[in-house]
Amino acid sequence: MEIFNTAPLSLPRLPDKARVTLLALGDVGSTLLMGLRLLGGDVISSIGICDVRDNVAARWEFELDQIAPPETEPLPEVDIIAPEQLFDGDVFLFCASRMVPDTSVTSGDVRMAQYGLNRELAALYARKAREARYRGLFCVVSDPVDPLCRAALRESALAPAQVRGFGLGVMHARAMYYAGKDGR
């Protein structure tokens, strides 16, 4: 009897140019959105944005769709979508957060302080992905990335290869930042 399935996990098949949907346009989501709009034209067809604050999504759509470099391929169009449309794309980016610790907090792991409330939010959208029979990538960008990926995987019934976290690069960069300040 085989205890472990050793078959490699394969990512969902994405089109040459993927439809990306992004939830929450706070500091993280809006920074990511700018990068995707400016640098993602070769792999992104369009970007759907959703935020609980309608005026925030409208502002970003207004600003970003007016950026057009003169001599390059067209940039991916940004459009405002309803929450029900978040899982109509190929790649879903979860940037939502109910709690961001103040920068003055110095004791304890601030990412874990975020976990309780953010877990509920990640679980909610994971269940929505399940209800929508979502077949694309569910990408977690909000902190703490690894525990939120686990919560999303458990709540969604998505395949493990569909849930991706983007946190190790941040942790490496944070370590490099503090190492550079250390002076030893």
Residue ranges and their predicted role:
Residues 38-42, 65-69, 85, 131, ...:
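Short, surface-exposed basic-aromatic patches at helix termini and helix-loop junctions that form
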Residues 73-135:
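Rossmann-like NAD(P)-binding element
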Residues 2, 46, 50-89:
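Conserved N-terminal Rossmann-fold NAD(P) cofactor-binding segment
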Residues 25-30, 53-55, 140-150, 167-172:
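Gly/Ser/Thr-rich loops at beta-strand to alpha-helix junctions
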Residues 127, 131-154:
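Conserved Class I SAM-dependent methyltransferase catalytic core
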Residues 1-59:
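NAD(P)+-binding Rossmann beta1-loop-alpha1 motif at the extreme N-terminus of oxidoreductases
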Residues 19, 166, 173-184:
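Substrate/ligand-engaging "lid" and interaction regions
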